[in-house]
Regions:
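N-terminal small-domain helix-loop-helix segment of the aminotransferase-like
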Residues: 3-94, 101, 275-278
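PLP-dependent enzyme catalytic core of the Aspartate aminotransferase-like
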Residues: 73, 153, 335-344, 350-381
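Conserved PLP-anchoring active-site segment centered on the Schiff-base-forming lysine
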Residues: 105-127
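A short helix-loop-beta submotif of the ANL/AMP-binding
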Residues: 129-135
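A short helix->loop->beta-strand "cap" motif at the edges of active sites that frequently abuts
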Residues: 132, 189-192, 220-221
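Active-site phosphate-binding strand-loop segment of PLP-dependent enzymes
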Residues: 139-207
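Conserved core segment of the aminotransferase class I/II
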Residues: 215, 220-291, 295, 299-300, ...
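Conserved glycine-rich beta-strand-loop-beta hairpin in the small C-terminal domain of fold type I
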Residues: 273, 289-298, 308-321, 355
Length: 381
């Protein structure tokens, strides 16, 4: 007997499809967002150390104390706010689990949730499984800025949650402090929560650095901020993330977390805590690290017929291929992989409504040689 699907429209993600296609055709994989280089040697050594020391049993449900303390210190350093170690920080099995737990905890059947398209593909299924209704606000290229009048018009008595993402995947734009002020002005008199997906917080090239919801005194009282150590330390396979939220929200989120995963890899948590404490220069220097790769890739693509859109954060570039082909973006990405040998992601998969723009996403979290080889192929188009 085959059960009725709760998510009938969903299949294998485009990221899995394109990575498989890239492997099949031995293409340079700039589609899925992972590095082709390893993370810090010190972090690997600390993981091995903690395994050898016997830290191989369940961690506390909320995360090991050393890591929660390190997160609190980093948050205070960067955003001027020190969350309570015991009641406001929860370590999760990657950022995606944190997003799912937050949505499940906050969204009730019939609630409306606002997100901004293009958007990360895990939001919609989580909202659907919680019984909520997703209302999407389309952001327009090339700058993908929020129209706050349009946002205010989208609010209703049913609005329960706003999901934002900064630095933004896939558009590579970032929110400014003025955006958070505008968000607060729009929701201050309403019972609306905020889920701020900040997994690329340390890959921000904007003047003044990353603007976090945690730096806004009023918003953080009703917000969940989510981040990812996989992005920060080039270790996406470790799947360790965390969220910061007020105690009352964290308590509800933890009820979901304890029955999703209960706890997270113990030696990895301890190794990350060591890394944050002993080598904070890693995340402080990360913007410069990725800016160098971004600039190298953009310069190498200059002779191509691709139009590169502004990149203020993340490790993704958007490229307009309208001067090259009339194909839709999904077909173009498949052709690019099979015939040119470079795998990319079509922007339309991040949107529910028809996406008329000819844009693809390219990941530059790669070694310089990989980026130059990909650029050589793309410049031949």
């Amino acid at each position: 007997m085959i059960p009725e699907s709760k998510l009938p429209a969903l299949g294998t993600t485009i990221f899995t499809q394109m990575s498989a296609l890239a492997q099949q055709h031995q293409a340079i994989n700039l589609s899925q967002g992972f590095p082709d280089f390893d993370g810090p040697r010190y972090l690997q050594e600390r993981l091995a150390y903690h395994v050898a020391q016997g830290a191989n049993q369940y961690a506390p449900m909320t995360g090991v104390p050393a890591l929660r303390e390190a997160i609190a210190g980093k948050t205070a350093e960067l955003y001027g706010y020190q969350p309570d170690v015991n009641s406001e920080i929860t370590v999760t099995a990657g950022a995606t689990e944190a997003l799912y737990a937050a949505i499940t905890a906050l969204v009730r059947r019939g609630d409306e949730v606002i997100c901004f398209d293009p958007s990360y593909d895990s939001y919609a299924p989580a909202v659907a499984l919680a019984g909520g209704e997703l209302r999407r606000i389309a952001l327009q290229p090339p700058h993908f800025r929020v129209d706050w009048r349009q946002f205010a018009a989208a609010l209703s008595e049913k609005t329960r949650l706003v999901i934002l993402n900064t630095p933004h995947n896939p558009s590579a734009t970032v929110w400014q402090r003025e955006d958070f002020a505008a968000l607060w002005q729009a929701i201050a008199e309403r019972e609306i929560y905020v889920l701020s997906d900040e997994v690329y917080e340390h890959i921000c090239f904007a003047d003044g650095g990353h603007a976090s919801v945690l730096a806004h005194p009023q918003l953080r009282e009703r917000a969940v901020a989510v981040s990812s150590f996989g992005k920060t330390f080039h270790m996406t396979g470790w799947k360790v993330g965390y969220c910061v939220a007020p105690a009352a929200i964290s308590a509800e989120l933890r009820k979901v977390h304890q029955y999703l995963t209960f706890s997270v890899n113990t030696p990895a948590q301890l190794a990350i805590a060591d890394m944050l404490r002993e080598a904070p220069e890693h995340y402080r220097e990360l913007p410069a690290f990725y800016r160098e790769r971004r600039d190298l890739f953009i310069e190498a693509l200059r002779p191509s017929r691709l139009e590169i859109l502004p990149c203020e954060g993340t490790y993704f570039l958007q490229a307009d291929y309208s001067a090259i082909s009339d194909l839709d973006d999904v077909s173009f990405c498949r052709w690019l992989t099979t015939e040119v040998g470079v795998a990319a992601i079509p922007l339309s998969v991040f949107c529910a409504d028809p996406f008329p723009h000819k844009l693809i996403r390219l990941c530059f979290a790669k070694q310089p040689a990989t980026l130059l080889a990909a650029a050589t192929r793309l410049c031949q188009l």
